[in-house]
Structure formats: C-alpha cells, structure tokens
UniProtKB/Swiss-Prot annotation:
BP GO terms, sorted: chaperone cofactor-dependent protein refolding
Protein name: Co-chaperonin GroES
SUPFAM superfamilies linked to this entry: GroES-like (SSF50129)
GO molecular function (one): protein-folding chaperone binding
Localization terms from the record: Cytoplasm
Keywords: Chaperone, Cytoplasm
Length: 96
C-alpha cells in the first residue's frame, strides 16, 4: 500500500465479522453488523501540539484496535481494498 496518513490520522482495515448467529443462522443485511475491530495499516507522524511539537501516536502498524465507527470515519478504496481513515481519537482500545 502506497499511502501515508497525515498528522494524527490512522489507516485501518476492518476485520471480518462472523456472519452466523450463535444458533447457526446466517445473518444478512441489517442483521449482520459491521465489526469495530480493525488492523492498523499505516499511521501519521503524530498530533501537532499548540507549542508546535509533535506528539507521537500510541498505535503502531500491525496493532489490532477497537474503533468508534461514526462521524469522521472516511472509507476509501486503495489498491482494490476498502480501508478506513480515522483520527487516533476515534480509536477506543488496542487489543493485546
């Protein structure tokens, strides 16, 4: 992938979600929810603080994260893959 996010932006790829219920029923349409877990593909250099210094991001390439899938999440197709561009503020947790 040949893309570099700016500042505190992070590029992530949503993980696949299980499409069967606990009872074995195949979920489709609105019943199949989108995963809020994703793999970090690229990170910006960091948040620029008021004094001009750059605060590095807490996430790194390869991390699995849980993110807030709402306003401010930008979906893009890059190299044929759908990725999301989000601010680090939209990342709720790193899965360890």
């Amino acid at each position: 992938m040949n893309i570099r996010p700016l500042h505190d932006r992070v590029i992530i790829k949503r993980e696949e979600v299980e499409t069967r219920s606990a009872g074995g029923i195949v979920l489709t349409g609105s019943a199949a929810t989108k995963s809020t877990r994703a793999k970090v593909l690229a990170v910006g250099k960091g948040r620029i603080l008021e004094n001009g210094t750059v605060q590095p991001l807490d996430v790194k390439i390869g991390d699995t994260v849980i993110f807030n899938d709402g306003y401010g999440v930008k979906a893009e197709k890059i190299d044929g893959e759908e990725v999301l561009i989000i601010s680090e503020n939209d990342i709720l947790a790193i899965v360890e």
